[in-house]
Each structure stands twice: as C-alpha cells, then as structure tokens.
A protein has these predicted regions:
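Aromatic (often tryptophan-rich) hydrophobic motifs at membrane interfaces
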Residues: 103, 123-128, 238-353
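Cationic, low-complexity basic patches in intrinsically disordered or flexible, solvent-exposed regions
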Residues: 4
Length: 374
C-alpha cells in the first residue's frame, strides 16, 4: 500500500549522512592490471551500485547497526576499470580473541564481470590498503565465488554458498504456490489450514515495545535448546530492529491464545528480502507454526512488491551441516540459488596461521573434555 507523503519525507530524513572524505586516500593499483581501488563515501558507493542487487549488509543503513554494536565502519571502496565501477565493498572492524579483522558481509557487490582474476586482484589491492592503513588488522573476511590459494576457511562462524529464494513476483498466494514444487504447495496449504484451525494469528509486529519483544525473544531460547546452538543476547536482535528501522527490518510473529510461538526477523533492501533470523516453539510443531508463518511472510512481502525472500542457506559440499535445514527450505523453490560464500583472506599469513593453530588446539581440548564427560 502507498505510504503517506510525510512518511516518505521521514524516510529520507532518517537516511544516514556519511561524511565526505576530507583527506581521500590515493588510488590503489598494480602495474599488471587496469583496475584500481578507490576509497569513497556512502553516497558515491550508493550511486555506483544504482539499481543493482544491493545486500542490506553493504548499504548505509547497515552502518547504524554495526556502530550500535561497537563495530565501526572501516571503509567503503570502489573497484573500477577506467573510471567505471566494477565492484563495491564496505568493511567493518571486528574483534575476535583480541585480534582485529575486517568483515564485508555479502560484499563485494559485483557490478560488472566477476572473473577469478578480478576477484583475486581486488583482494590483492585490499590487502595492500590494509597494510598501509591499519597494521593491527590480521585478516579480511569477505565473499568470493571462486576458490583460490589466498582464501582460507572461516576461523569462526559458518557460511553458505547455496540458498533457496521464494519467488514473490507472482504476487498472489495462488500464483506463488503454482511455481513451487508440488510437495511445497501441499505443505503451505496444510500449514495454513492447521494453524488457522488451531486459532493462530499472524501479524507484522515490527513496532512492538521492548517489553513485548523480550517475551517474543524467549521463543528463540527454546529453539536454541532444541536445536543445540547458542543464540545472541536479546539486545542484538532488538538493536537490529531499531537501528535499521521499519524500512529495512521487519518482525512477523505467530501467536496462539496471545502467546508468541514463532517469529521471523526479515531484512529488506530494495526489492529483495532475507529471512535473517527465526524461531519456533516446540508446541508450534503441533500446528505447523513455522511453516504457516514463513508462508504468511512471503505472501505479505509479495503484496508489498518484493521480488524474492531469501531463506539464507542450504547444504552443499562445502557446508554439509546445512543439509537438514536445506531440506525444509527446498520445498519453497523449484531450484537452488548459488551465492558467493564467505572466506578469510589473511593479511599476515604468519599471524593467521598462528590463530588457526590456536583454534585447532582449543577445539581438540574441547572435544577431549566432551568425550570425558560422555
């Protein structure tokens, strides 16, 4: 639905105003290639990307969230060929075990041909920039399509290089279901019916109070205990909602008798949406709460004009641990979508090797303690 003119003005007023670079860095290049790397501000990066797919983590809006979490913007850069943008990247300063690294989530954003040679050259230029600007940075975490000798598996967290995206272009639930696999069509219709008969309600609760959000968060504790992972503190999710704002972050909640049983935190950028976080209670399985909620979210976003809902991650030969969740997600799309996975790019190979060795030792000790407890 169309928004009031005042809302449009408010959106524009809320956009972060990145400061202009008063002392711009020199343009970085190598003698063997024509592409160059240049530091830019948020406005110039946004103009360069234009109408191309722009992951929310690379937008100016994301800077608000990272700043609120104590992870400042390290820099935005344009990779260009004869003055024409080829790729854009925003990097944030992170700390892990007392060591500093840079994280470009879902970056770089490629605007022209993404060849193995260009990927490698961009990384070479970035390493050079880091060595000049900040000797405390140990590695860069960024995405790449092609395996290469300078890439390492992640020291922490997991990535994904395959995902499923619900096609929202058909807009109506009937047409959206028609382009899904047969078992997916049956599943969403059944989930919709079972949840309705159980008396469930689903709504957009993006503007809820902190007190109410804390109650919704408790569903994630139950999910984590069931599925064996450690969730972030509630403050992380709340900060994401409030710092990104309704234009880029939404919270959809399924309730039964007023009690929250499932929720999706969905991020948006342009015409694209991503199911960033989600949770469901054990009881919700009896009335297919998570399935009903995911389908409702997809239908709602389709009506608002979004073109896809990325379910974020599916199993692959590189990340087999995502196989099970991928089996659930595959019902929503006819085909898997290949995406660039994240990699670590050592700036100092010696120090990074030491960090890797220390992690292997910690993992081995943890496994040994676990086996003794068993």
């Amino acid at each position: 639905p169309a928004q009031p003119a005042m809302a449009d003005k408010a959106d524009k007023a809320d956009k972060p105003k990145a400061p202009r670079l008063t002392h711009p860095e020199p343009v970085h290049s190598t003698p063997d290639r024509s592409e160059t790397l240049r530091r830019v501000d948020g406005r110039e990066m946004r103009l360069a990307v234009g109408n191309s797919h722009f992951p929310v983590e690379q937008t100016e809006a994301w800077e608000r969230f990272e700043e609120a979490m104590g992870r400042p913007l390290w820099g935005r850069y344009l990779y260009e060929d004869e003055g024409k943008p080829v790729a854009a990247i925003a990097l944030y300063r992170y700390e892990m075990g007392g060591q500093t690294f840079l994280w470009a989530k879902h970056g770089p954003v490629w605007l022209k041909e993404q060849s193995p040679e260009r990927e490698a050259h961009l990384r070479r230029l970035l390493r050079s920039v880091v060595k000049e600007r900040d000797r405390s940075v140990r590695f860069i975490r960024m995405h790449a399509r092609y395996r290469a000798a300078d890439l390492r598996e992640l020291l922490s967290t997991i990535t994904y290089d395959r995902t499923y995206v619900i096609d929202l272009v058909p807009k109506t639930p009937e047409k959206m279901a028609a382009v899904m696999p047969k078992d997916g069509r049956r599943a969403v219709k059944r989930a919709e019916r079972v949840a309705r008969e159980a008396g469930c309600t689903i709504s957009d609760e993006t503007g809820l109070s902190r007190e109410e959000f804390d109650k919704v968060y408790e569903v994630l504790r139950e999910t984590a205990e069931r599925d064996g992972f450690k969730p972030h503190d509630a403050e992380v999710y709340w900060t994401m909602l409030t710092s990104l704002g309704e234009k880029n972050a939404r919270l959809f909640v399924l309730r039964k008798d007023g009690v929250p049983h499932a929720w999706d935190l969905i991020l948006t950028s342009g015409k694209d949406s991503v199911a960033y976080y989600g949770a469901s209670s054990n009881e919700s399985r009896t009335f297919r709460g998570a399935e009903a909620l995911d389908w409702w979210a997809a239908c709602t976003l389709a009506q608002e004009g979004y073109r896809g809902l990325d379910l974020m991650g599916a199993g692959s030969t590189r990340v087999p641990s995502l196989y099970t969740v991928g089996q659930y997600k595959k019902r929503y799309a006819q085909h898997v979508t290949e995406v660039d996975g994240a990699w670590d790019v050592p700036v100092s190979r010696v120090i990074y090797s030491g960090m890797s060795a220390a992690k292997r030792l910690r993992d081995a000790l943890r496994a040994r303690r676990g086996s003794r407890e068993d």
